[in-house]
A protein has these predicted regions:
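Basic helix-turn-helix/winged-helix DNA-binding cores
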Residues: 1-69
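C-terminal regulatory/oligomerization modules of transcriptional regulators
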Residues: 1-2, 76-126
Length: 126
């Protein structure tokens, strides 16, 4: 994709509402969004890549404040690579802990399903 997209096209492509796109821009998560002479937003391919990453952070539970801090570091340039890496390591560790917790809960649910299956088999053979 080499040409800029309107906010409606980005919403349709990304599944993110136009309201959310405007909010993300206002919150500082999407910066330097281009504008037409009439003031309509124009998103570059790099903006869509960044939006996808922001949505991954959101989907994995990073709070808006964390995403804002990461976006602010990103806006400062390459000198913040270390700080951004540290933030992502911390977030990854939190995601891994959540996955482990979910796996433990899933295992307990699977055990209960197996219990009921065995109980039903035993009851039917009587």
């Amino acid at each position: 994709m080499s040409k800029a997209l309107t906010i409606g096209q980005v919403a349709a492509t990304s599944g993110v509402s136009t309201h959310t796109l405007r909010y993300y821009e206002q919150a500082g998560l999407l910066r330097s969004i281009g504008r037409t002479d009439a003031g309509h937003r124009l998103y570059a391919p790099g903006d869509l890549d960044w939006l996808q990453f922001v949505m991954r952070l959101k989907a994995t539970g990073m709070p808006i404040a964390g995403m804002q801090a990461f976006a602010a570091l990103r806006a400062e340039g390459d000198a913040t690579f270390g700080a951004r890496r540290a933030m992502l390591i911390e977030h990854r560790d939190a995601v891994l802990a959540r996955i482990a917790e979910l796996q433990t809960n899933l295992d307990a649910i699977s055990d209960k399903i197996a219990f009921y299956e065995a109980a039903e088999r035993e009851a039917s053979t009587g």
